[in-house]
Amino acid sequence: MHILVVGLDYKTAPVEIREQLSFEPSELGTAMSKLKEEKSILENIVISTCNRTEIYAVVDQLHTGRFYIKRFLADWFGLEKEDVSPYLKFYENDGAVEHLFRVACGLDSMVIGETQILGQVRSSFKVAQEEKTIGTVFNYLFKQAVTVAKRSHAETDIASNAVSVSYAAVELAKKIFGRLSDKHVLILGAGKMGELAAQNLQGQGIGQVTVINRTYEKAKELAGRFSGEPKSLNQLEKTLSEADILISSTGAKQFVITKEMVESANKKRKGRPLFMVDIAVPRDLDPAISEVEGAFLYDIDDLEGIVAANLKERRAVAEQVELLIEAEIVEFKQWLNTLGVVPVISALREKALTIQADTMQSIERKLPNLTHREMKLLNKHTKSIINQMLKDPILKAKEIAAEPNAEEKLLLFKEIFDLQVEDEEQKVEPVQVEQGSFQLFKPNMAQGFATVASE
């Protein structure tokens, strides 16, 4: 059993590739259930955002896990494996655990410390629970990821003054126009990204805001909160001819604004430039728009320069979060180690309770005149004796699981108590950890915790 991450993000794939491999939120449950049917996949969670698509899986073998996840991605999006492979990254075991914690804390985001990703991790976790695509390992691991992210926000300043992609879009507009107080901004899409853009625009004292959304009521609700004007989608072309700035994030599967629409709007603009930022994945705006005179088109990847300036200021704080993550990884490993001793403890309890039950049957045969109350008291007290006798051996077995020679000692433990452990898949195997010379032990993870792998 191994933990594996297969995915791509803004560092490994440009936006034109990411948009081809992006899951709709409504697809996540179906995708996870489908992936669960693949050979080698024991547990899985899919996380898909504008900047990343990642599959987290518990697999029985790393090489087969990689193969079937790559095949699943290619099949789901109608691509060839060879077209997908160059953009994929792989993390294994402790590298996978560390990566998840970094993602949840916002350390792996384009915008260091952003908190939106935590909500997306929690959302995917909830879907996986509903679809029953996860078990013991991921239930524990993802709860811990949420916990470490909350700790990073509470115990450090990583989330303070963190810019968002929407903030970066507004900053880019400010760099081009200087001041925004006399500009007309069109926000296309009333989702979370559109809301963040509206907040940042309000902070910059924007002159006029128009919100257009496929659902007019949502446009009206968002516009009302930021003193803007809502409009329906059929007014899009007319508004394009009036606005100075467009920030788009609809989540549509096809282009919402085409080159022809911008060319048509351009005829009424009298030479005024139109600045457009497409922060949607898949993209809302046809890349061919950049060929139109007076139209300046930027996508989410063009915002990295602005984000980089923010990154410098946040590196010291990020180091504090890294220390938290290191401690949480150790805690997860310790928990994982205890899984190896679970079947041993279960076998010990089962044997003791069998002896107690046989003893009670013998007493009942030899002392048939005992009342029901007397038998109940005897049953209670004999079980109490069993629990007291088992307490120290069980605690010792748990301590043994974390020791360097755990496998040898647990074998001796089983021999002493003559235990028959049926679940051989849960047997304890040594794990060589790269940091230091000690070994950890956990159920059926013979390859151990490896760092990020390449393929």
Curated annotation (Swiss-Prot):
Binding annotation for NADP(+): G189, A190, G191, K192, M193, G194
Reactions catalysed according to its record: (S)-4-amino-5-oxopentanoate + tRNA(Glu) + NADP(+) = L-glutamyl-tRNA(Glu) + NADPH + H(+)
Active site annotation, chain numbering: C50
Which Enzyme Commission numbers does its entry carry? 1.2.1.70
Molecular-function GO terms, alphabetical: glutamyl-tRNA reductase activity; NADP binding
**Entry's transmembrane regions:** none
Q: Which Gene3D superfamilies match?
A: Glutamyl-tRNA reductase, N-terminal domain, NAD(P)-binding Rossmann-like Domain
Q: What is known of its domains?
A: Possesses an unusual extended V-shaped dimeric structure with each monomer consisting of three distinct domains arranged along a curved 'spinal' alpha-helix. The N-terminal catalytic domain specifically recognizes the glutamate moiety of the substrate. The second domain is the NADPH-binding domain, and the third C-terminal domain is responsible for dimerization.
Q: How does it assemble?
A: Homodimer.
Q: What family does the database annotate? A: Belongs to the glutamyl-tRNA reductase family.
| Extra facts | During catalysis, the active site Cys acts as a nucleophile attacking the alpha-carbonyl group of tRNA-bound glutamate with the formation of a thioester intermediate between enzyme and glutamate, and the concomitant release of tRNA(Glu). The thioester intermediate is finally reduced by direct hydride transfer from NADPH, to form the product GSA.
Q: What does this protein do?
A: Catalyzes the NADPH-dependent reduction of glutamyl-tRNA(Glu) to glutamate 1-semialdehyde (GSA).
This one is known as Glutamyl-tRNA reductase
